[in-house]
Amino acid sequence: MNAVDLRAKSVEELNAELVSLLREQFNLRMQAATGQLQQTHNLKAVRRDIARVKTVLTEKAGA
């Protein structure tokens, strides 16, 4: 997910994307806690995607 793609989305779409990413992060964390997560790099990728979405939302709020 690129920041350029995110900037093209509306605030409502970004909020929906954020909720989706937070749910995915929760599921990955539960898998990691129970020892079922094989691809641990996904946790880092989702965390950074959440940060990107929040950054773009902040930019749009200021503009």
Swiss-Prot record:
Entry keyword set: Ribonucleoprotein, Ribosomal protein
InterPro entries referenced in this protein's UniProt entry, alphabetically: Ribosomal_protein_uL29, Ribosomal_uL29, Ribosomal_uL29_CS, Ribosomal_uL29_sf
GO molecular function: structural constituent of ribosome
PROSITE patterns the record matches: RIBOSOMAL_L29
BP GO terms, sorted: translation
Pfam family, one: Ribosomal_L29
GO CC list: cytosolic large ribosomal subunit
Family to which this protein belongs: Belongs to the universal ribosomal protein uL29 family.
UniProt protein name: Large ribosomal subunit protein uL29
Species of the source: Photobacterium profundum (strain SS9)
